[in-house]
């Protein structure tokens, strides 16, 4: 799908989405985006389980991208595995920064203390950008009540900088 087609698609879908449930939005998106070109990005946090459950109902093999920052607790990783098994998710892909980037940029593993933005870019943003290159769209768990900057989030939007369709079924 070309960028201009994506933009038109986003406008058209937002016009009809106000009548749809979150599950219906996921199912519709799953049908419309080419197989293998849609992913869910999830933290596997408590609120994220709702979205993971909805996705599992539509397609348990949909790629689910989980960012391992290498700073997560063992319990967090174990919880991610338990939730995946419980929901029957079969295509969870753990993404992380490349080891050589850690060694070069954050050799002591303390960048989060001195430059949180650089740490976030190294451990979250860069790996996510790399992983999303394979996809035309991605599902996000953003909600309108999560702050003033998200108060007007639409069900479908173009992800600036990535030229991907971003689907927000829980807005």
List the model feature ranges, each with a label.
Residues 1-171:
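Nucleotide-activated chemistry modules centered on ATP-dependent adenylation/adenylyltransferase
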């Amino acid at each position: 799908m070309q960028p201009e087609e994506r933009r038109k698609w986003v406008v058209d879908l937002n016009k009809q989405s106000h009548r749809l449930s979150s599950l219906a939005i996921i199912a519709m998106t799953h049908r419309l985006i080419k197989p293998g070109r849609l992913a869910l990005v999830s933290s596997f946090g408590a609120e994220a389980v709702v979205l993971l459950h909805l996705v599992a109902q539509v397609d348990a093999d949909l790629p689910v991208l989980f960012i391992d920052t290498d700073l997560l607790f063992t319990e967090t990783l174990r919880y991610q595995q338990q939730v995946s098994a419980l929901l029957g998710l079969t295509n969870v892909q753990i993404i992380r920064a490349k080891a050589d980037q850690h060694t070069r940029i954050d050799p002591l593993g303390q960048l989060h203390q001195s430059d949180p933005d650089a740490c976030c870019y190294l451990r979250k943003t860069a790996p996510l950008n790399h992983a999303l290159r394979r996809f035309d769209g991605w599902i996000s768990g953003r909600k309108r009540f999560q702050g003033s900057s998200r108060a007007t989030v639409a069900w479908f939007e173009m992800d600036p900088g990535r030229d991907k369709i971003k689907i927000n079924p829980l807005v």
